[in-house]
């Protein structure tokens, strides 16, 4: 048996008539009452879930911790990566290409290879249980960001540097007054990359801040919250949405400049 569509002629409370598909001149009587099917899904948001998640997860503290780690690391990322990329793109010295190749090759080095010696080193100098292992390494440049910045810097004509040098500008003055202002799109792209990375970073804070819940960022806090309230999906979804609002907002307001910076770095003049 299966479903069959019939043309309704008369609809009644207890009895209805349909056209007989085998004999259109006759009617089929049907005994039964009508009822409306319930909607399988309804929009009924419970805003109390956001309030409860905000309180239970101690979201203000986690937000502050994550923002501080991200901003401190962002300062180091911009300072170190811009300086290194400027050196590779504007200065000629023996072994420049070889050194740049070695720097870029570190991108392919898995983090799992260095995590044990890195943790042992930070533990030896007493940094475990602090933000230092999560922030200080960013002051030593990142190969991926160096590559993006270097490629963008190379699209800026050298004639601009030469004209500034003739006017008496030092290399540092050329960097701060010419290169950096002209590289706003790629710098914003690097900023967004770092902020999203710091906001989503889970493994490093987990191993370095496992004994310090008051210093943990939002990714670790959400994982702990999920372990406690895993049987309550509304709370988990509310907390995850609140945690993702800032990266989404930053990307939306910077989307045009971000895409411009990423695209232009692939064009070398």
Each predicted region: which residue ranges?
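A structural signal for multi-pass alpha-helical bundles of membrane permease subunits
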Residues: 1, 5-269
């Amino acid at each position: 048996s299966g479903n069959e569509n019939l043309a309704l002629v008369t609809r009644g409370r207890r009895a209805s008539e349909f056209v007989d598909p085998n004999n259109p001149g006759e009617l089929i009587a049907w005994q039964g009452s009508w009822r409306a099917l319930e909607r399988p899904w309804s929009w009924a948001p419970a805003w109390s879930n956001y309030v409860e998640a905000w309180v239970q997860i101690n979201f203000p503290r986690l937000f502050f911790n994550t923002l501080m780690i991200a901003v401190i690391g962002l300062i180091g990322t911009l300072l170190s990566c811009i300086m290194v990329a400027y050196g590779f793109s504007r200065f000629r010295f023996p072994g420049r290409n070889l050194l740049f190749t070695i720097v870029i090759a570190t991108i392919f080095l898995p983090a799992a290879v260095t995590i044990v010696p890195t943790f042992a080193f930070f533990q030896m100098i007493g940094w475990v249980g602090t933000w230092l292992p999560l922030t200080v390494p960013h002051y030593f440049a990142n190969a991926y960001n160096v590559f993006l910045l270097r490629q963008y810097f190379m699209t800026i004509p050298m004639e601009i540097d030469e004209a500034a040098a003739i006017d008496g500008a030092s290399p540092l003055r050329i960097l701060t007054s010419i290169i950096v202002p002209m590289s706003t799109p790629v710098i914003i792209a690097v900023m967004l990359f770092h902020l999203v990375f710091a906001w989503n970073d889970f493994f490093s804070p987990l191993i370095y801040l496992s004994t310090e819940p008051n210093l943990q960022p939002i990714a670790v806090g959400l994982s702990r919250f999920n372990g406690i309230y895993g049987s309550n999906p509304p709370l988990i979804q509310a907390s995850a949405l609140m945690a993702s609002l800032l990266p989404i907002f930053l990307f939306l307001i910077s989307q045009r400049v971000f895409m411009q910076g990423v695209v232009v770095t692939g064009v070398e003049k």
